[in-house]
Amino acid sequence: MQAWYHCENVYPFVPQEVLDRAPSVRASLPNKYCDPKIAADLFEECLDEHLLCDELGVNVVSIEHHSGINSLYGASPMILGILARQTKQVRILSLGTLITVRPDPVRIAEEYATADVISRGRLEIGFVKSGDSEMVSGNANPVGYVERFWEAIDLIQKTLTSHDGPFSWEGKYYTHRHVNIWPPVYQRPHPPMWAATGDPETSAELGRRGMVNALVLRGPEASKRAFDAYREAGLPAPGTDRFAYAVLCYVGDSDEEGLRVGSKTLWFLNTSLKQSPQMSKFLPGRIPAEATAQNYRTAPLPGAEAARRPADGLIGITAEQAIARGILCAGNPDTVYKQIMDIYDKVGGFAHLIFIGRTGFLDHKEAEKGIRLMAKEVLPRLPAETSTPAAEPARAAE
């Protein structure tokens, strides 16, 4: 199994009374509450954690969120460029550039190709539809975003795999009459492609495309439904290399330390998910028409759970509840290993463990200790991945 270190690089230092008054802690919270000197320290610490991962053989993840306390990584291509140059051996996953918010997929493909070349073929590309507040801060139209998501992926893939001169693209959402990026990708035909999603319909489409399906903080039950939909619709006998599971995770010397420090990661759920209704359930086009009426109610009626954001059910949970629901793994190395394997068995296996090892008030020293214990005491015991027979591994350009 491959482990991927995920650091949100959050900004948890806004006074609680400000957060309590704010209708949303994303998109609309004034940036006067973010001290750039503190932000500089956070960037340095988080990037150093990625370099530690490079020493220990733990792959790294670059994420992208905008305009809020939940993450300072608003410019994923810049982080990718830094990691591509500074790391030397591990894989780098972009999870990812928000393609439904960015207006130009060709530019995104160009950024990915450049990072792949700088890293000498260590890039993995992850796509994200984007959250509600991202649509607002990105000045994007949420109507038709699912179709736009798939067309952007198609255009990016064609851009990365075309090497015989310019081509033109006439799509429903994107038009490019001259596409011909330099440099081309280092890996051929293109770097491995992922998508972070949780609904079975999208997972089924990922299965048909042979992409890696990543489930982020969805728990074993929802993840199994998505993975099963992938298996039923996609490649025959897909291996575990097509599945990724992301979980809040902290490994301590003892169960007491692991749980105490790991509980700090729940800040991400309990504080940084707060959004105003106009940036969530009242945002047009984000919810199927048949669920809209129920979604607008103050309290959804029975049977209307599909209209809620998956994140809504995570706000306010305790560490014990999060562990029971497969959202958090915390304890000593033996305990965390057992927790991971319990999730592994429930979902039917996965080859990629994305462990969110730093968020909230969990500090740099604690994060580095957790990374070391994960790399040395837990990762070597996790099962090897199984490969998908029909999958052609990416290779370096000749």
Language-model features: locations:
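N-terminal beta1-alpha1-beta2 module of alpha/beta enzyme domains
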Residues: 1-93, 191, 393-398
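Conserved, mostly hydrophobic/aromatic
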Residues: 3, 53, 64-65, 83, ...
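Hydrophobic faces of well-ordered beta-strands that scaffold small-molecule active sites
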Residues: 3-7, 61-63, 92-95, 123-127, ...
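Glycine-rich anion/phosphate-binding loops
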Residues: 41-42, 100-114, 330-338
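Acidic (Asp/Glu)-rich catalytic clusters
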Residues: 54-55, 80-89, 112-123, 204-208, ...
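Glycine-rich, proline-tolerant flexible connector loops at the mouths of alpha/beta enzymes
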Residues: 60-83, 99, 136, 217-218, ...
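A conserved active-site cap/scaffold subdomain adjacent to cofactor or substrate pockets
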Residues: 198-222, 226-227, 231, 244
